[in-house]
Structure formats: C-alpha cells, structure tokens
Amino acid sequence: MIEIKNLGKQFQNETEIEYRDITFDSGKSYMLLGASGCGKSTLLNMIAGILSPSKGSIVIDGVEMSAATQKIKDKFRIGKIGYIFQDFKLINDMTVADNIGILRLEGVDVSDMDDMLRSLDIYEKKNAKIKHLSGGQKQRVAIARALVKHPDIILADEPTGNLN
C-alpha cells in the first residue's frame, strides 16, 4: 500500500505542485491522468525516492519514507519498486543485457532476464547496444529492466509511449 499525505513539491522557479491525499491499495492497478506538466512524473519520482517532497509524506507498506534511513530507502527502491521511465534511462553505449545485468551491482537476481526479454519480444537484440535500437525496442528493454526484479510495486511513466 502507498499512502500520499499532504504532499507537495516546490521547485526553484517557484512552481509548486500539491497533491490530494491518496491511498493506492496493494494488488490493484491505478492510472494517473492529467495535462502535461501537472505533476504526474513528479509524483512517481517522489514515490520512487528520486525526488524528495517539499512537504507531506509518502508511506509505503507502513514505512514513512521521509523518516526512513537511506539503507531502508535503498531496500525499497531496489527490492520493492520497479520503475519504467518515460525516457527509458538506459545507457546507450551498453548492450541490452548489460543495461539489465547492471542491476546485479545492487544485489538484484536477474537470472530470468532471457525469459523476460523473450516475453517482451526483444531477446534477439540482447547483445545489441542501446544506441542501435528503435524507440519501441528501448521501451521494451526499460520494461524488462523494471520487471526482472519482480517488484511489489511497478511505477510506469507513459510505458507504452513508444510501442507499436
């Protein structure tokens, strides 16, 4: 379960985004809809621990993330949360396999990477560098990287934007 309470984000240019209190129950899927620039990606980035809120709290499975130690935050980011970024966040000069395999450095078991790549119809590009892939292929790699962790929580920021 994810609980958002009195959450807000202030940016240097004085832009402030405020969110309603929201509870995302475990085992359910949710979709955020809104105009460009309204803060959907910012909210996902705060839940993932990439951005810190200016006010309020994010509670994941009973743990208030703003009060958690960095070790606990890392445990959640690595083990509980898979994030499919809008702009892929892949390393262009590395292969598909290496972009997923790099998760091993964080202790993630990627032993079923090949099966994940096959299920997303990108296995044949396993040894290709990211810079040689189409947008849709890069999106599939980003999805595989998020899912290979078997996370409890999947955050997806426009995950099908480049798929055909």
List the predicted regions and their residue ranges.
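Conserved ABC ATPase "signature" region
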Residues: 64, 110-125
